[in-house]
């Protein structure tokens, strides 16, 4: 049968092969056509790097399938991997290495099984089948290694109704992961969940470790109500601003919306409702602020008075 091999330069090579051909055989055919030594060739299909001893049939490569040819650069490059203990490991890699390959190298050096490793670069968790090049990881880049702890830890999630949910998590779980676990238990879609810890709303891409959330910590779950509501903010000049908000918005969120509309920095804003100054980490629901409520905005003058 015929298969195609596409190079990084965009050139496509046509090869005559059989399903029973091994990856070694295919690399030899590429060498015959293109003069590239097999030890400099890496073949990728469906996002997987193909191993020399396996056959095309093993990978379900059929007629007119397209393989991608990536060259192993002689000499490769060095990258660094920093662990939570602060130790830095140096690895010899190539841009075409997959994240699996990198985890295997870390295992060789440190003895940590790949299934206990999570690698983070530029705030993103790296997926096994992708390559360093896919993530634009270049020479002397630093990856962060977070360990998946066996057995993990328990945390609690308290809802506004007072119900407490217990979750099994790991420090390396992202907030998205936690919301997915809450959905599994309670059926609440992640896009309706807001999680608060220590007065801060937690961002989806960050991990529990990023927020220093440890075993038996309690998170607060606030629901984003679909459609939200309008409230009014009255300034000392008598001007009234209308804002689109949700009960689960924190006072910080409201100040940010006021900044968007009026250009007043949040640190110069004080919001008053029912004679009380509102605290940043709390939500509108905490203060029983409902649709069409009016807040009063007082400016903090720089330097105080």
From Swiss-Prot:
<protein>
    <recommendedName>
        <fullName>Polyubiquitin</fullName>
    </recommendedName>
</protein>
<feature type="domain" description="Ubiquitin-like 1">
    <location>
        <begin position="1"/>
        <end position="76"/>
    </location>
</feature>
<dbReference type="InterPro" id="IPR000626">
    <property type="entry name" value="Ubiquitin-like_dom"/>
</dbReference>
<feature type="cross-link" description="Glycyl lysine isopeptide (Gly-Lys) (interchain with K-? in acceptor proteins)">
    <location>
        <position position="76"/>
    </location>
</feature>
<dbReference type="Pfam" id="PF00240">
    <property type="entry name" value="ubiquitin"/>
</dbReference>
<comment type="similarity">
    <text>Belongs to the ubiquitin family.</text>
</comment>
<dbReference type="InterPro" id="IPR050158">
    <property type="entry name" value="Ubiquitin_ubiquitin-like"/>
</dbReference>
<feature type="cross-link" description="Glycyl lysine isopeptide (Lys-Gly) (interchain with G-Cter in ubiquitin)">
    <location>
        <position position="48"/>
    </location>
</feature>
<feature type="domain" description="Ubiquitin-like 3">
    <location>
        <begin position="153"/>
        <end position="228"/>
    </location>
</feature>
<dbReference type="InterPro" id="IPR019956">
    <property type="entry name" value="Ubiquitin_dom"/>
</dbReference>
<keyword id="KW-0677">Repeat</keyword>
<dbReference type="InterPro" id="IPR019954">
    <property type="entry name" value="Ubiquitin_CS"/>
</dbReference>
<comment type="function">
    <text>Ubiquitin exists either covalently attached to another protein, or free (unanchored). When covalently bound, it is conjugated to target proteins via an isopeptide bond either as a monomer (monoubiquitin), a polymer linked via different Lys residues of the ubiquitin (polyubiquitin chains) or a linear polymer linked via the initiator Met of the ubiquitin (linear polyubiquitin chains). Polyubiquitin chains, when attached to a target protein, have different functions depending on the Lys residue of the ubiquitin that is linked: Lys-48-linked is involved in protein degradation via the proteasome.</text>
</comment>
<dbReference type="InterPro" id="IPR029071">
    <property type="entry name" value="Ubiquitin-like_domsf"/>
</dbReference>
<dbReference type="GO" id="GO:0003729">
    <property type="term" value="F:mRNA binding"/>
</dbReference>
<feature type="propeptide">
    <location>
        <position position="305"/>
    </location>
</feature>
<keyword id="KW-0963">Cytoplasm</keyword>
<feature type="domain" description="Ubiquitin-like 4">
    <location>
        <begin position="229"/>
        <end position="304"/>
    </location>
</feature>
<keyword id="KW-1017">Isopeptide bond</keyword>
<feature type="domain" description="Ubiquitin-like 2">
    <location>
        <begin position="77"/>
        <end position="152"/>
    </location>
</feature>
<keyword id="KW-0539">Nucleus</keyword>
<dbReference type="GO" id="GO:0005737">
    <property type="term" value="C:cytoplasm"/>
</dbReference>
<dbReference type="GO" id="GO:0005634">
    <property type="term" value="C:nucleus"/>
</dbReference>
<keyword id="KW-0832">Ubl conjugation</keyword>
